[in-house]
């Protein structure tokens, strides 16, 4: 049987009628099945023929498909009983009750049926046009397709076929007739397998099977040796067969988000790979053969269960990105220092205590280093040279108790440092040399003092010092004129310096959970401030100048047990959207007004303000 023949395997043909129904013409006998009987030839040679004769003799009455009475074209309608009365028992048509097995299930709405029919018609028309016009690119994505018509075999000119985001559970065998196909997108369907006929698509370069229901890599894929790009992300694949080695032309392979426990030695045969993504699987080890993939520039291994990395990884001298986040590594091999093209090194979420001596210094192209959520107790060895070209360092959530003096002396491009959740008690004496720093996160440490030299960090835009042991902020903070976010939450601060008012670019000031008794009047100069949190302090009053904060949108002053009244000037904050005054003994404002939200409180303040005539 030639599945790719336009005439098909039988003599019947299908066409779309003007009413939207598919009309079938067949050279064989036909049988019409009705709800109340069987009419026409093709049945047994007994009663059916005689019944037809009897019906013809009875004014040629016919049985309609809707279950109504037989119709006499030349006279009145006859009931079934009347028909039976004029017919011998042996020639009477048998009563047939047709009941679908799922007839008890809720029936789809007419609207849904019409929509599906229309979708099917659109697909058929698209395939016909593709055949008639020799179209090379066909996009049937998001078309609610459940079954791809076998007439797809006629679209032999196709080089690109997009079927993503449908409801296809199985491809027709005729897909193999598309011998010119180069790009086939089947992502976001319900495929559990692929037909063997796909092997005839010998020119296929790109195959996208993301987000399907494949429990294994279909064996036919291994026969598509022209493939350069294969996406198998988010399926249910548990293993990779040794036949993978046949796909020697692959440059991109994605097996992300499956259930793969082992990557066999066959991976080493894919010497043309430039991108390999096996993240979010269950790998515990990598084969040594990974070192044969010398053209790899991106290797993503994050979110696995890797216990070690083979030394052969040092052979990947073209590697630019290596993702090792969230595994079970205790160390990395020193051979990584040979991967001198790497610009990002990320081992977040492992159990690493130290890196090999001088490894980072050897990776001179690094711009981003992420060592967060490990077991480091000190900075990596290698001195200032290891951060020469780095602009971002993340050591969050480790056990580091100090930043070595001069460690960033060569890091002229360092703009972002995250030391959150460590054990720092002080900053190094040369902190004033970090002049290019833009974002500095020192939250959740044990800092007791902020050095005056902080004034030199004049490019700083984000300074996070929350959850430390600071008692005061130096006056030199006013020199940080570019500061947009200042987070001092959960310290022991009692007084803010007057110079805080010089931070005209400040948008968020977080002072929650301190021991502040009053805000400086200069706070009114913070014209760009949108968020001010002073909750859980010891405020006795708010300065009148708070009314000058024309950009203020959120104000948290809750849980200040000594705050008994609000200044009338607060009503001047026209952009205020959220006001939290819970657990403040505001005796002057009625409870029902307080419960009404910020707009009602502001309205009350305005009505009772001496400025109400203004």
Swiss-Prot record:
InterPro entries: Leu-rich_rpt, Leu-rich_rpt_typical-subtyp, LRR-SigEffector_domain, LRR_dom_sf, LRR_R13L4/SHOC2-like. GO terms for cellular component: cytoplasm. Gene3D superfamilies: Ribonuclease Inhibitor. Keywords: Leucine-rich repeat, Repeat. One of its GO terms (biological process) is cyclic-GMP-AMP transmembrane import across plasma membrane. SMART domains: LRR_BAC, LRR_SD22, LRR_TYP. Signal peptide: none annotated. Acts as a Ras effector and participates in MAPK pathway activation. Probably acts as a regulatory subunit of protein phosphatase that specifically dephosphorylates Raf kinase and stimulate Raf activity at specialized signaling complexes upon Ras activation. Belongs to the SHOC2 family. This is Leucine-rich repeat protein soc-2 homolog.
């Amino acid at each position: 049987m030639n599945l790719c023949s336009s005439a098909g395997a039988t003599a019947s043909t299908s066409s779309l009628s003007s009413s939207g129904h598919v009309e079938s013409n067949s050279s064989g006998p036909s049988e019409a099945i009705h709800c109340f009987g069987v009419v026409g030839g093709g049945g047994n040679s007994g009663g059916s023929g005689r019944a037809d004769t009897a019906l013809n003799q009875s004014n040629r009455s016919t049985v309609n498909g809707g279950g109504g009475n037989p119709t006499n074209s030349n006279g009145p309608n006859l009931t079934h009983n009347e028909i039976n009365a004029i017919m011998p028992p042996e020639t009477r048509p048998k009563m047939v009750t047709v009941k679908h097995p799922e007839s008890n299930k809720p029936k789809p709405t007419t609207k849904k049926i019409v929509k599906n029919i229309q979708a099917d018609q659109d697909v058929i028309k698209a395939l016909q046009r593709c055949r008639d016009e020799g179209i090379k690119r066909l996009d049937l994505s998001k078309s609610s397709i459940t079954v791809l018509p076998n007439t797809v075999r006629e679209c032999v000119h196709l080089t690109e076929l997009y079927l993503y985001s449908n409801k296809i559970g199985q491809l027709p065998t005729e897909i193999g007739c598309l011998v010119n196909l180069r790009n086939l997108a089947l992502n976001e369907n319900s495929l559990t397998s692929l037909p063997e006929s796909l092997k005839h698509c010998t020119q296929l370069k790109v195959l996208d099977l993301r987000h399907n229901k494949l429990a294994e890599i279909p064996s036919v894929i291994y026969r598509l040796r022209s493939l350069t790009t294969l996406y198998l992300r988010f399926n249910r694949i548990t293993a990779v067969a040794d036949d993978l080695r046949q796909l020697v032309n692959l440059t991109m392979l994605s097996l992300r988000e499956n259930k793969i426990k082992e990557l066999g030695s066959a991976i080493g045969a894919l010497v043309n790979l430039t991108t390999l993504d096996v993240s979010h699987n269950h790998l515990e080890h990598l084969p040594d053969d990974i070192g044969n993939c010398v053209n790899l520039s991106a290797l993503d291994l994050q979110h696995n269960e890797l216990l070690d990395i083979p030394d052969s990884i040092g052979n990947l001298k073209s590697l630019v990105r290596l993702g090792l986040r969230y595994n079970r590594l205790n160390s990395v091999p020193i051979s990584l220092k040979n991967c001198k093209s790497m610009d990002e090194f990320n081992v977040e979420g492992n159990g690493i205590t130290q890196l090999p001596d001088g490894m980072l210094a050897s990776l001179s192209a690094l711009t981003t280093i992420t060592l967060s959520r490990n077991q480091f107790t000190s900075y990596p060895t290698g001195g200032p040279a290891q951060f020469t070209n780095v602009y971002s360092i993340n050591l969050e959530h480790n056990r580091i108790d100090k930043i070595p003096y001069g460690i960033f002396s060569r890091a002229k491009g360092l703009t972002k440092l995250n030391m959150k959740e460590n054990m720092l008690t002080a900053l190094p004496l040369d902190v004033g040399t970090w002049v290019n720093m833009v974002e500095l996160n020192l939250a959740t440490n044990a800092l007791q003092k902020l050095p005056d030299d902080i004034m030199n960090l004049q490019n700083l835009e984000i300074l996070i010092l929350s959850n430390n042991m600071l008692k005061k902020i130096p006056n030199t903070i006013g020199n940080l004129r570019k500061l947009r976010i200042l987070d001092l939450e959960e310290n022991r601060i009692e007084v803010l310096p007057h110079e805080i008012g010089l931070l005209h670019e400040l948008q968020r000031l977080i002072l929650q959970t301190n021991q502040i008794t009053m805000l400086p009047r200069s706070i009114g100069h913070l014209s760009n401030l949108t968020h001010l949190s002073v909750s859980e302090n010891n405020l006795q009053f708010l300065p009148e100048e708070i009314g000058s904060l024309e950009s203020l949108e959120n104000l948290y002053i809750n849980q200040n047990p000594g705050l008994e009244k609000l200044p009338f000037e607060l009503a001047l904050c026209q952009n205020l959207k959220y006001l939290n005054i819970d657990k403040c003994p505001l005796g002057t404002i009625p409870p029902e007004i307080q419960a009404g939200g910020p707009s009602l409180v502001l309205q009350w303040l305005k009505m009772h303000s001496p400025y109400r005539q203004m």
